[in-house]
Regions:
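Charged/polar, solvent-exposed surface patches and flexible loops
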Residues: 8, 86, 104, 132, ...
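Extracellular/lumenal N-termini and interhelical loops of multi-pass eukaryotic membrane proteins
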Residues: 75-130
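C-terminal module of multi-pass small-molecule transporters
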Residues: 1-93, 142-163
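Short, surface-exposed, polar/charged, turn-prone segments marking secondary-structure boundaries
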Residues: 36, 83, 98-103, 172-177, ...
């Protein structure tokens, strides 16, 4: 998951198929990691602590997800805005627009075709150059987000070394039976 998350940093405006493949592979590993976390939650604690353990695991997952989303969104927004402010007007100026109109085009790009049409001096060449620079600014921001995910992944990989080995607990023994089961009397707690 760490590897394919970091490989998302290879994004360009022209390699959509490769990025879709990396997203699918990364999502597969993410799903596998969810099952692993459930196994550690359920098998790593005594029977009477299952509810508490599951609650803490769920809370940690939701809190971690919220924190990661806030961090990644902040990185994406700030990096893309900074990069677009530097590259979009420069690309439009190289394509023949004045600097003032290029700045107006930068402000109009996220607003759609109607806003772009109102910018004076906009030509097809300038619009094409500015649009490509805008796409590259997003690609750059996504690259920074993908590389920043490495820090979380490396910390997670280091935490794996401190996890309990669950192999001795992977047996045929059933810890808890349903109360209406014929083996309900084997339950330690009722």
């Amino acid at each position: 998951m760490v590897l394919f998350g970091a490989l998302m940093g290879l994004v360009t405006p022209f390699n959509q198929s490769l990025m879709i493949a990396f997203c699918c592979i990364n999502a597969s590993f993410f799903g596998w990691a969810q099952y692993e976390s459930i196994a550690f939650t359920q098998l790593g604690v005594p029977q009477q602590d299952l509810g508490f353990s599951g609650g803490l695991a769920g809370m940690a997952r939701y809190a971690g997800g919220s924190l990661a989303q806030a961090i990644y969104t902040t990185i994406l927004t700030n990096t893309q805005t900074t990069r677009a402010a530097a590259t979009v007007p420069a690309a439009a100026v190289r394509a023949g627009m004045s600097l003032e109109n290029a700045q107006a085009l930068l402000a109009a790009l996220p607003l759609g075709a109607a806003a772009i049409a109102e910018v004076p001096g906009t030509t097809a060449e300038a619009l094409g150059a500015a649009s490509l620079a805008f796409q590259w600014s997003y690609a750059h921001a996504l690259k920074v987000v993908a590389l920043s995910s490495l820090s979380f992944g490396i910390v997670g990989l280091l935490c794996i070394f401190y996890c309990e080995d669950l192999t001795p607990k992977m047996t045929d023994k059933v810890e808890v039976f349903l109360e209406n089961d014929v083996y309900a009397d084997k339950n330690e707690f009722h």
